[in-house]
Swiss-Prot record:
Gene3D superfamilies: Zinc finger, CCCH-type
Residue ranges, annotated region (Disordered): 1-36, 134-179, 313-347
Polar residues bias (residue ranges): 333-344
InterPro entries named among the record's database cross-references: Plant_ZF_CCCH, Znf_CCCH, Znf_CCCH_sf
Listed name of the protein: Zinc finger CCCH domain-containing protein 65
ZnF C3H1-type: positions: 108-136, 237-265, 285-313, 433-461, 477-505
Organism domain of life: Eukaryota
Residue ranges, compositional bias (Low complexity): 14-31
Basic and acidic residues bias locations: 1-10
């Protein structure tokens, strides 16, 4: 046994079996030799074979997962049973060691595919990566006569499966630097055929579409479908996209000029349907706070975009039941329909305000026909109270212009104290504070919504005395500048409560004569005092 241990164990063929490695002499011993020596020799050969197998197992590289790659065997033997010289075997060993030094990537069929490896053909984690690295399908390339692999310069069926080294070089050779393969022979992500054993469910549940071939950009089709659905929703629901600022507390600053759609709540009402407009074209919002600027000045720079309430003058009438009209009837109810008709006459509402809140206001007759009513006759209840003078004559400018007939200043219709129901505003309703500034809203409109709570002064006579009104019912104040609105349009929205001058031409009334033509009506620009 000591001699057997001293001898070097012979190398065994990897494809040979232990029975095949026994020499014929030991398998068929001579009849004259001792049987004990034969058994000892057989045991020595079997023991040497086991030691050789253990040594080869230590020298062989660990499996890398590439089943289709060649296995390099260290030693003087190669698969096939042929023996090579020591120099050739050493060269094969060096070549195998160089192949082992290149990065390898594991195959893990039960794990998801490595995203980075699928896109770029490389993975920085190498063998430590816990994901699957499937085989990449290469482009079919026709090799020339001098570029053939193997003996005879042709590709044999045994070399159909490429080595891992060639597959690692494939991304650089075929797809460029870090650009996914978009050739027609592979799918959009560079996967192999759909029948491969790798687990592709996690990366193929979304379908992709190539949107830029040069840059290698891909986009999920789900995003494209979502964009198309959004366009269809916009086209089906309305002809324009919905404004995103309209539903915010600040609203849309463009108002009706906005090119997007303004929807109100789930019902989808547009802004043209949601509010009514008063006679000035301002929105009526009964449930909202009254616009402070509108209540002070009678106008609002925000127009229809204002979020506050702009009540009509008829809606702010006094609640005192003792106030009556000049004919002794009960006060008329406020006309609500006038708010939605901007072209309707605005002075019935203003007349109601003046009758209830402004003292010393007498109704003036209508001069549409150019004649005065008989003395003592009052106009009917449906009288407008204020007639707008036409600005443009119906006849050419060559027609001689006559002055409008004026009523005597002492006409009984202009004597407000004689009209019942028009008494002076009681001091209990509006406080008088001589040391404080005058309430501008009370001076202009004759009404103050704060009443006794107002901290400003409310003079007892906010309008001019009797006899200072023109036939149009507007105050004549020579010491004040001409009302800009009256001089421009011929009307004044404040009526008798206006603090500016509203001049008018007066001349003696002719004894008898035909009615005046429409072209003979005076204009606000043609007046002299």
């Amino acid at each position: 046994m000591a001699d057997a241990d001293a001898r070097a164990p012979p190398k065994s063929d990897p494809g040979a079996t232990p029975i095949g490695s026994i020499s014929p002499s030991s398998a068929a011993p001579a009849a004259g030799e001792d049987e004990v020596e034969v058994e000892v020799e057989v045991e020595e050969q079997l023991a040497g074979l086991a030691i050789a197998d253990q040594g080869e197992e230590l020298l062989l590289p660990k499996p890398t997962g590439w089943e289709d790659g060649p296995v390099v065997v260290a030693g003087d033997e190669v698969s096939g049973g042929e023996k090579l010289p020591g120099e050739v075997a050493a060269a094969v060993g060096v070549e195998g060691a160089a192949a082992d030094s290149r990065p390898r990537f594991p195959r893990r069929p039960g794990e998801p595919d490595c995203t980075y490896y699928v896109k770029f053909g490389s993975c920085r984690f190498g063998m430590k990566c816990k994901f699957n690295h499937p085989a990449r399908k290469k482009k079919s390339r026709v090799k020339g006569s001098n570029g053939g692999s193997g003996s005879g310069g042709s590709n044999s069926s045994s070399n159909k499966a490429s080595s891992p080294d060639d597959e690692q070089q494939a991304p650089k050779e075929e797809y460029g630097s870090y650009v996914p393969d978009i050739s027609p022979e592979v799918d959009s992500l560079g996967f192999a055929d759909k029948g491969s054993a790798s687990n592709l469910e996690n990366f193929k549940k979304y379908s992709y579409e190539i949107i830029d071939v040069k840059k290698g950009r891909v986009e999920p089709k789900e995003l494209k479908v979502a964009k198309e659905k959004r366009k269809e929703f916009i086209s089906e629901g309305s002809s324009q996209e919905e404004c995103k600022y309209y539903s915010t507390p600040g609203g849309c600053k463009f108002g009706k000029a906005c090119k997007y759609l303004h929807r109100d709540g789930k019902e989808g009402k547009t802004d043209a349907e949601k509010v009514d407009l008063n006679f000035l074209g301002l929105p009526l919002r009964p449930g909202e706070k009254e616009c402070p600027y509108y209540m002070r000045t009678g106008s609002c720079k925000y127009a229809t975009n204002c979020k506050f309430h702009h009540p009509d003058p008829s809606n702010v009438a006094s609640k005192d039941p003792q106030l009556e009209h000049e004919n002794g009837d009960a006060p008329q109810q406020d006309v609500q329909g006038s708010s939605s008709q901007p072209n309707a006459s605005i002075w019935p509402d203003q007349r109601t305000v003046n009758e209830h809140h402004v003292p010393f206001i007498a109704p003036s007759p209508s001069y549409s026909a150019g004649m005065l009513p008989p003395q003592g006759m009052y106009p009917p209840p449906e009288w407008n109270g204020y007639h707008q003078v036409p600005l443009n004559p119906y006849y050419p400018p060559g027609v001689p212009f006559q002055h409008f007939p004026a009523a005597p200043i002492n006409h009984p219709m202009y004597k407000a104290p004689e009209i019942p129901g028009h008494q002076q505003v009681p001091s209990e309703e509006y406080p008088e504070r001589p040391g404080q500034p005058e309430c501008q809203h009370f001076v202009k409109s004759g009404f103050c919504k704060f009443r006794m709570k107002c901290k400003y002064h409310h003079p007892r006579s906010p309008v001019p005395p009797a006899g200072a009104l023109s036939p149009l019912g507007l105050p004549i104040k020579p010491d004040q500048p001409v009302c800009t609105y009256y001089g421009r349009y011929g009307v004044c929205k404040f009526g008798p409560a206006c603090a500016y001058n509203h001049p008018f031409n007066f001349s003696p009334v002719p004894a008898a004569g035909p009615p005046l033509l429409p072209a003979q009506y005076p204009t606000p620009g043609n007046y002299t005092l």
